Regions:
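C-terminal structural segment of proteins
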Residues: 1-268
Length: 268
């Protein structure tokens, strides 16, 4: 199928993009790796497409002593290749390198993936376990939202209709931090059936775990220290049940194993 006809605008900066997006039935375009197929299948039919890919602010990554801020249009490939700073000592590069295929990574963006909020995508779970902060711009100015408040459900976020995601700020891991991630896919490059992520950062007081690829937003275990110390089957299953996955025995077991393997990688 082909998309229905729409108007197209290429704004020069964030403020101009917000003016265009104030039009009724407009849609922002970042990498287009999710939006493109949705347009072709006519799942979405915007009257106006606003292309954000040429806004310099959204393509930049800035580093401070404590964090790295990634513009929304930083591509997966830029992270994979090390063309932008990695605050996680290689973890984000590994995540990016295992997203879909290189052609997708060349165009797909970290901000587009997060704003799309597909539970089976990698960045929602990975950024949740890292404790990222989402930077948002709208007609009323700019605001910041913690990622666990930003991701609200299945393809749902805290973004208002007239706002855009402009950046993601990721705190730097301390020297003693350990992070683990595991996903199950039917075949390489596909969206995940189950995701487990774990972060143990004692210098910052973090012992977090995330159960991803659920029926909604990633399920955050904000204090997972006891689970890290003793990741027994029943404790893992209870955690998975808390993510609303108790009804399907296969899915429940798959998520429990993904979480266990992510925790095991902390000691690797």
């Amino acid at each position: 199928m082909k998309s229905h006809a729409f108007d197209y605008q290429r704004p020069r900066d964030v403020e101009e993009s917000l003016r265009f997006l104030s039009n009724e039935n407009s849609k922002p375009l970042a990498g287009g790796q999710s939006l493109g197929p949705m347009l072709n299948l006519r799942i979405v039919q915007p009257a106006l497409l606003v292309d954000l890919r040429h806004i310099e602010e959204l393509k930049a990554a800035t580093e401070t002593k404590d964090s790295v801020t990634f513009g929304a249009c930083v591509t997966h490939a830029a992270i994979e290749d090390g063309r932008v700073p990695d605050p996680t000592r290689g973890f984000m590069r590994e995540i990016a390198a295992n997203i879909a295929y290189r052609a997708v990574r060349n165009r797909g963006t970290i901000g587009g993936s997060l704003a799309h909020a597909d539970p089976a995508a990698d960045w929602p779970s990975a950024l949740s376990v890292l404790g990222a902060t989402v930077l948002i711009a709208g007609p009323g100015g700019r605001r910041e939202v913690l990622i666990d408040k930003f991701l609200t459900g299945l393809f749902e976020t805290a973004l208002k209709a007239d706002e855009i995601l402009v950046a993601i700020r990721v705190p730097k891991l301390s020297a003693r931090a350990r992070v683990g991630y595991w996903k199950f896919c039917r075949k390489a490059g596909e969206f995940a059936q189950a995701i487990g992520a774990a972060l143990d950062d004692p210098d910052r007081g973090f012992a977090r775990a995330v159960i991803g690829a659920t029926r909604g937003a990633p399920h955050l275990l904000a204090d997972a220290a006891a689970l890290f110390a003793k990741p027994e089957k029943q404790a893992l299953l209870r955690a998975v049940d808390g993510a609303g996955l108790a009804a399907d025995a296969y899915n429940r077991q798959l998520h429990a194993v993904a979480l266990r393997r992510a925790i095991e990688k902390l000691a690797a």
